[in-house]
UniProtKB/Swiss-Prot annotation:
Protein name: U11-theraphotoxin-Hhn1a
Top-rank taxon: Eukaryota
Organism of provenance: Cyriopagopus hainanus
Entries under Pfam families matching the protein: Toxin_22
Main location: secreted
Family: Belongs to the neurotoxin 14 (magi-1) family. 01 (HNTX-16) subfamily.
């Protein structure tokens, strides 16, 4: 019976001491993995940041193109009176003094070029 107790005690002591060593090794491995994981996360974060900056630059570029009056504002059609000093005739039209009809109105009209 004593030999069983001694054997059990010996196995218990060995298990505890080896378990402590394994625990320390596991802790070291976990620290290494977390450091590698952090470096991977930093890399992924930088990559995502670059992509977001590129996307933001494209969006700002599109906004600036729209703000440069790329679209034509409301314009005056053909045969409609216009202001000589501030003509707003549509593209392809010119603000001219009428030749025949409308002479009595003393106004300018949008005509084709």
């Amino acid at each position: 019976m004593n030999t069983v107790r001694v054997t059990f005690l010996l196995v218990f002591v060995l298990a505890v001491s080896l378990g402590q060593a394994d625990k320390d090794e596991n802790r070291m491995e976990m620290q290494e993995k977390t450091e590698q994981g952090r470096s991977y996360l930093d890399f992924a974060e930088n990559l995502l940041l670059q992509k977001l900056e590129e996307l933001e630059a494209k969006l700002l570029e599109e906004d600036s193109e729209e703000s440069r009056n790329s679209r034509q504002k409301r314009c005056i059609g053909e045969g409609v009176p216009c202001d000589e000093n501030d003509p707003r005739c549509c593209s392809g039209l010119v603000c001219l003094k009428p030749t025949l009809h409308g002479i009595w109105y003393k106004s300018y009209y949008c005509y084709k070029k």
